[in-house]
């Protein structure tokens, strides 16, 4: 039988003792240790970052030569590390990706999400809302991850979970389902991990870098340049030449008019053929 909910259990007290903002720090720490997802100097994006439990661990993993970006609907208190950048971002807004790219223009090697819905106690509803958040996070990951990158997200286990797993398997080389030790016994949350984002699934990772923008612009330039080329090809000069070639024929047609009656008959026959 599961233990009753205790908001101040072992991991809560341990987090407070170690200066961590949330018990979730132990969850991502375990996942990183087991799967080696980050190195110094890399870039990581944390969705639903407040209060900063994940972000504290992720920032230490990438170090001062890397970059850790955290976004949430609520403000994230500063960590005091210059390579950590945070912002208030609504992932449902059309400009969400642009906001993220102002914090880091390049692709990320890891995207994490500890987002959870406001539960109402109805399991099927809570599960459905959790899946919506994971899919929203996955959409952001596909548009910001570099090929070969990884994705970690919290989700509530339920009847539709196998469908989500198949969606991840279609995009990543490896998919793992992890239940860290710091998850409460009474909780049915797990973390899904996708490793090795396939190049075909990385829909907008190249555009996450600002560099390709001028490339696409310059590509369109030759297209406009080709317009004069096609114009010069279809220049009416040859048509005018044909018209000028036909002009001298008019006197030649008039010449038989001074000839015999038979010549006039031939001219009339030719005229009737042209009329047809």
Swiss-Prot record:
S-adenosyl-L-methionine binds at residues 52, 54, 72, 90, 114. The keyword Methyltransferase applies. Keywords: Cytoplasm, Methyltransferase, rRNA processing, S-adenosyl-L-methionine, Transferase. Residues 265-276 have a biased composition (Basic residues). Its main location: cytoplasm. It catalyses: uridine(2552) in 23S rRNA + S-adenosyl-L-methionine = 2'-O-methyluridine(2552) in 23S rRNA + S-adenosyl-L-homocysteine + H(+). Its EC number is 2.1.1.166. GO terms for molecular function: rRNA (uridine-2'-O-)-methyltransferase activity. Residues 203-249 have a biased composition (Low complexity). It is found in: Cytoplasm. The keyword rRNA processing applies. It is an enzyme of class 2 (transferase). Residues 203-276 are annotated as: Disordered. GO terms for cellular component: cytoplasm. The active site is at 154 (proton acceptor). It comes from the Bacteria. Specifically methylates the uridine in position 2552 of 23S rRNA at the 2'-O position of the ribose in the fully assembled 50S ribosomal subunit. Belongs to the class I-like SAM-binding methyltransferase superfamily. RNA methyltransferase RlmE family. This is Ribosomal RNA large subunit methyltransferase E. The lineage of its organism: Bacteria, Pseudomonadati, Myxococcota, Myxococcia, Myxococcales.
